[in-house]
Amino acid sequence: MSKTIILLAFFLSIVLNVQISFVVAESKVYVVYLGEKEHDNPESVTESHHQMLWSLLGSKEAVLDSIVYSYRHGFSGFAAKLTESQAQQISELPEVVQVIPNTLYEMTTTRTWDYLGVSPGNSDSLLQKANMGYNVIVGVIDTGVWPESEMFNDKGYGPIPSRWKGGCESGELFNGSIHCNRKLIGAKYFIDANNAQFGVLNKTENPDYLSPRDFNGHGTHVASTIGGSFLPNVSYLGLGRGTARGGAPGVHIAVYKACWVQRGCSGADVLKAMDEAIHDGVDILSLSLQTSVPLFPETDARELTSVGAFHAVAKGIPVVAAASNAGPTAQTLSNVAPWVLTVAATTQDRSFPTAITLGNNITILGQAIFGGSELGFVGLTYPESPLSGDCEKLSANPKSAMEGKVVLCFAASTPSNAAITAVINAGGLGLIMARNPTHLLRPLRNFPYVSVDFELGTDILFYIRSTRSPIVNIQASRTLFGQSVSTKVATFSSRGPNSVSPAILKPDIAAPGVNILAAISPNSINDGGFAMMSGTSMATPVVSGVVVLLKSLHPDWSPSAIKSAIVTTAWRTDPSGEPIFADGSSRKLADPFDYGGGLINPEKAVKPGLIYDMTTDDYVMYMCSVDYSDISISRVLGKITVCPNPKPSVLDLNLPSITIPNLRGEVTLTRTVTNVGPVNSVYKVVIDPPTGVNVAVTPTELVFDSTTTKRSFTVRVSTTHKVNTGYYFGSLTWTDTLHNVAIPVSVRTQILQRYYDEN
């Protein structure tokens, strides 16, 4: 009977909903983008938004019910709940640039700074010269912050910069007057667009705090990686022990919570957070957020972070963003606009070897984050029935086959938690998983889960098959760091080329993003408020921390100058001089589509010698060069813009890289460099051409003095290939013996244009 009632009620609800849908059209959240604001008074901007909605909806009450956000600082626009027909009507108003549906974004996730050479050291170290980042303000758009973490204590801080116009909002378990301090100077949260799209947050289904407080720890981890205070004797399950700190321990942090557990990040909320951050006076914006391909063009307001970033950069605020976690597949990058600093993820010179000793006394070193007691010699098994040795199929085995034993399995694809769950449910004592390297280690305190590659896994399998009673001993993980551990681009890190504009190299730079130890909220799996996380989300704040230090030392540098300094001084080998590899289905030498300019080298970036600088006008010319229409460019700028005729070449955009996706015959391009090193300098060119490609630079020498700080040069590139090829890579370096200003060169020959080759 109860089932009948439930089904009847469900059926009636469907019928009623269908009937209502004929009467009331469904409202959705739309972003109405108006471009550059016409008033300096934010209240006047908001009033103009209300007037526009009033003309459409007919009453003040309807306007207040509809409007979600007013964007009134970095640009003009608003988010509102509208029906499809209302959105169409408002899009036809002459002052409206574009009306777009709301979009959703995802979050991407001790030793790091020493590995990169950013150590307190002596008075000549980068940290000391940059005064730890004091007086610089970084804005972090993420899941919020856990303010009680000691990483956010303000001991030794002076006053908050007088230019700061932001504040701290109170909310659930967050008191703005108590939880903010001279380090954590700002905390706001944005959920209106998320609520408008999905309904009011149901905390039973989606546990979170209606405040800037961080529930899952992602935002806390990011913020503490950028600027966490010094905290000694920190570890995770006993591993990675050392002094934890952020890259710029003296920076002021402003947190903007726009991402919510299980509901992601509403584009309209993120855009509002960016608008507020611009108004509040942040010096840098850090976004560990991603979308997935296919992407929208940079001039399309549906690419909300790109549009918001453009307005931030136009006001001198560098925007650092994650490359995405869809690797190792090519063309999977997000945040690809040329004005954004896009970050890939690498490992570092630290690993967690875990000794596996077989009954024949052979010891194999796997990788794990296992902090439990040593597992003495116990039974070892590999399920031999068809497919059941597959990690995804372990649950198909009888529990008796795994109970009381360590299980070996093979994973053909990225491993999931299914294998761990199956073994634990069967009463198994541990799991050895043979797989391609992904660097994603699941931390477990009392259950050994150890990863090995297929070769070592096969060795273990041969041992199992060679004896009637195979046994194994697994020791607790240890921490190993130093030159014996090489650097690799992480498997998950998204790869180029750029799917929107292939002549724009992405990613720009790489930084450690694997097993990064930082603060986290106590709601998550942690050890004393700290945890290891991996992702381009974790690499992004590493770069943001370096940008803070550069901004402290060079407050007059533009966002493009900072990007240039980082890209042109990057390591193309790891700090120990070993080649950097890129992990994937097979391991290969890393190239610019894996790591951009290379692995970030903070100490060198401070004194790059030369920079490839750009202004907002250069970005406008870029938009013209890739055939975006005058109308779409005008939408971004908020003012009428007419591209020159003929249009400029995208290859002439003054990037610290050269990427030619469709070379046929010969092409000539131009770059301009600005001297920021010794006044009287002479640089000579060194060319490492891509295979089968000729590169000639004119002039081959650049002379700078007190009256000449800028020099232009041309690059003539021609191919000797007679067929369509893949990309080949090289470099172009200007050197004065003190500085080596290197940019990557990526060239693909396309005899048949716009041709996709399956072979």
UniProtKB/Swiss-Prot annotation:
PROSITE patterns: SUBTILASE, SUBTILASE_HIS, SUBTILASE_SER. Residues 29-106 form the Inhibitor I9 domain. It comes from the Eukaryota. Residues 1-25 form the signal peptide. Keywords: Autocatalytic cleavage, Glycoprotein, Hydrolase, Protease, Secreted, Serine protease, Signal, Zymogen. One of its GO terms (biological process) is proteolysis. Coiled coil: none annotated. It is an enzyme of class 3 (hydrolase). Residues 112-606 form the Peptidase S8 domain. The active site is at D142 (charge relay system), H218 (charge relay system), S537 (charge relay system). Belongs to the peptidase S8 family. This is Subtilisin-like protease SBT3.10. The lineage of its organism: Eukaryota, Viridiplantae, Streptophyta, Embryophyta, Tracheophyta. The gene is SBT3.10.
